[in-house]
Amino acid sequence: MMDNILHIVPYTAQHGQFILSCQMNHKVLEADRHYINVDGDARNLVQDHLAFTGIVNDNPIFAAGMKMIWGQVAEGWVIATSEMWKHPLGVAKAIKKDFARVAKENNITRVQSAIRKDFSEGQRFAEWLGLEKEGLMRKWGFDGSDQYMYARLF
């Protein structure tokens, strides 16, 4: 796949390990780097039919999906390398395309995601996906950062 084209494939722990071992995709997220367990966190995101990876030239550049929390409630997540900025529209469209489909196909009624208060790009992306800001969670982040809870109901 050495064609500079974004290919979407099912997520694997190996994809996550590669992405998490690379530089984070935004300087604001570097604060979380010290709290990431590359192998364990990558494996923890594996859940059948709920996650996918974007690959360019045989390298994963982002992965996104949902992790069931309880009942029909899932946590939405995205991890990415800095390479994703070379394909921002393709990445955004791929995530938006599969976001609602994955939720509906798996009878998920709520998808939620915590986003750092100082990560405005992440907040705008969540809103573009149809998530609504529910409230501020003080000192909720790994590093004690304030984060907003965003959610979308289906």
Describe the role of every protein-language-model region.
Residues 108-127, 132, 140-141:
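Conserved beta-strand-loop-alpha-helix junction that forms the acyl-donor binding cleft
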Residues 1-36:
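Short amphipathic alpha-helix that is part of the acyltransferase structural core
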